[in-house]
């Protein structure tokens, strides 16, 4: 006879979870001193704790309401005639020609690199676009998606998704990881589920996890964060607490960035006490993880427009709300190119920090360093797509960061860690030579980025923007079966990040066995 059922346990925990207000820190119980133990012999209470969590998320996966899992009804009306084209570049000025033509026709540029430009447009606009392009570009494009509406529909969670659909296109090693992984990461999750999950993590792992908020969005939503570490268990600290900040979801449609933040948070949380490397890194640093800094836009991308990019703040043009959060920071802000066009996907606002969410994150970071006894030594801003690791500066290639050599060394180390984990290749370059700069050359501002602000204004020694999977086959509509593999490779990169920033004292930390696999829940 079973003493507990998953439903009974879940119902017992619901008051506990609901009692934790979103955006507030959770007071931990008396300090716990973690011990190291093996995967095969977990502590009894840890085993029960993990079983409870696994049971809860099994229930959520099977009984998730249609409100969260059903795609918006207007997908085919909005995107039924849209396609995504990739233009292959042969000459440097071709990217500028494409961007200029896209601005004239109000098209959505998905990606600009030194090799290609991806553009979304209605199929009946293709002749108009080609007429504005040089002859060399008129025959140098290929379709990436010829039925965008169906691709968008497929990106939403489905309660009837078959195992064969889920497993298509993945290597056997990746499938093995997914089969052992928490079901929470087998689908993209709406904000309401993510917030409840964060509260549960803080409640169940209170020795080293707290839930907090970095501010409130324009529409009044909390911007929740998880703070991982053991500093709250220490009565005295010597100097500011070293902190690593990881942010996702600046652009609402980049769902993989939000899911990756939750995956690496869960990996750090559950490896604590099991892995000596993770345990030491959580003793040395506070890790602050924000799944989405743009909750309003993220919710809107679930409920109304899957490809929404900006926040939901009103602008001077009522029909074109939203400011690009990654163009709104007050270091080398350059919003003149988009000031007169609030409809632009890159609209930077009428002045620096007009985007409320960017302002809130900056205020939180400044308060942490000025009053909270913290030193933000690392900043990782996760985006998609194109598989790039970018370091400062983004606003200009004529300005060289004073710590360029260290920035390059660590960036190459992150790329190597990813390659060793999944065999995926991430390009390493200055942001001014990557996607951001190509956009700037084409008249799209690249100033006002979070990457540059943290590095220059807050003196964060290691500041990066990481463009996650893939290289364009799916673009912003990366299938959910890539959540786990992407999370694994970024988790390994984060451990490499923490070890490098720590320096010589961490030279004895071994990451060889850190594959990014989840600690089993049963």
UniProtKB/Swiss-Prot annotation:
GO terms for biological process: cell wall organization; proteolysis. Residues 20-159 form a propeptide. It is found in: Vacuole; Secreted. It comes from the Eukaryota. Residues 187-501 form the Peptidase M14 domain. Glycans are attached at residue 367. GO terms for cellular component: extracellular region; vacuole. Zn(2+) binds at residues 251, 254, 383. Inactive carboxypeptidase that may play a role in cell wall organization and biogenesis. Belongs to the peptidase M14 family. This is Inactive metallocarboxypeptidase ecm14. The lineage of its organism: Eukaryota, Fungi, Dikarya, Ascomycota, Pezizomycotina.
């Amino acid at each position: 006879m079973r003493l507990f059922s998953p439903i009974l346990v879940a119902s017992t925990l619901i008051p506990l979870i609901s009692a934790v207000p979103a955006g507030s820190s959770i007071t931990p119980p008396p300090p716990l001193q973690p011990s190291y133990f093996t995967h095969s012999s977990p502590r009894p209470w840890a085993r029960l704790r993990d079983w409870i969590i696994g049971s809860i998320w099994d229930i959520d996966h099977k009984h998730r309401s249609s409100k969260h899992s059903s795609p918006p009804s207007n997908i085919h009306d909005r995107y039924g005639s849209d396609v995504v084209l990739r233009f292959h570049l042969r000459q440097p000025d071709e990217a500028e020609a494409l961007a200029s033509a896209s601005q004239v026709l109000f098209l959505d540029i998905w990606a600009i690199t030194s090799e290609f430009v991806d553009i979304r447009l209605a199929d009946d606009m293709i002749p108009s676009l080609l007429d504005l392009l040089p002859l060399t570009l008129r025959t140098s494009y290929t379709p990436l998606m010829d039925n965008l509406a169906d691709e968008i529909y497929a990106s939403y969670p489905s309660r009837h998704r078959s195992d064969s659909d889920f497993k298509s296109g993945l290597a056997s090693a990746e499938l093995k990881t997914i089969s052992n992984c928490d079901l929470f990461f087998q689908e993209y999750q709406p904000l309401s589920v993510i917030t409840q999950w964060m509260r549960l993590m803080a409640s169940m792992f209170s020795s080293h996890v707290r839930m907090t908020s970095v501010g409130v969005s324009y529409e009044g939503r909390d911007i929740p964060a998880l703070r991982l570490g053991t500093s709250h268990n220490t009565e005295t600290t010597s100097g500011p607490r070293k902190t690593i900040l990881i942010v996702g979801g600046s652009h609402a449609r980049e769902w993989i960035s939000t899911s990756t933040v939750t995956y690496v948070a869960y990996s750090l949380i559950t490896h604590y006490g099991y892995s000596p490397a993770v345990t030491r890194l959580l003793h040395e640093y506070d890790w602050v993880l924000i799944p989405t800094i743009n909750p309003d836009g993220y919710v809107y991308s679930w409920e109304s427009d899957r490809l929404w990019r900006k926040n939901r703040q009103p602008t001077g043009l009522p029909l074109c709300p939203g400011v690009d959060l990654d163009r709104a920071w007050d270091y080398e802000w350059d919003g003149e190119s988009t000031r007169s066009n609030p409809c632009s996907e890159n609209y930077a606002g009428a002045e620096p920090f007009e985007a409320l969410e960017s302002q809130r994150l900056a205020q939180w970071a400044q308060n942490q360093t000025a009053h909270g006894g913290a030193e933000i030594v690392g900043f990782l801003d996760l985006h998609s797509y194109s598989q790039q690791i970018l370091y400062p500066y983004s606003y200009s290639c004529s300005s060289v960061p004073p710590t360029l050599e260290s920035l390059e060394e660590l960036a190459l180390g992150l790329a190597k860690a990813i390659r060793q984990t999944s065999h995926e290749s991430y390009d390493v370059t200055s942001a001014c030579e990557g996607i951001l700069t190509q956009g700037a050359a084409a008249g799209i501002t690249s100033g006002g980025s979070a990457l540059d602000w943290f590095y220059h204004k807050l003196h964060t020694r290691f500041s990066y923007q990481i463009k996650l999977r893939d290289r364009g086959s799916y673009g912003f509509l990366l299938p959910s079966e890539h959540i786990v593999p992407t999370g694994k490779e970024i988790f390994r990169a984060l451990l490499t990040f923490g070890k490098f920033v720590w320096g010589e004292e961490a030279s004895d930390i071994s990451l060889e066995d850190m594959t990014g696999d989840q600690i089993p829940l049963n």
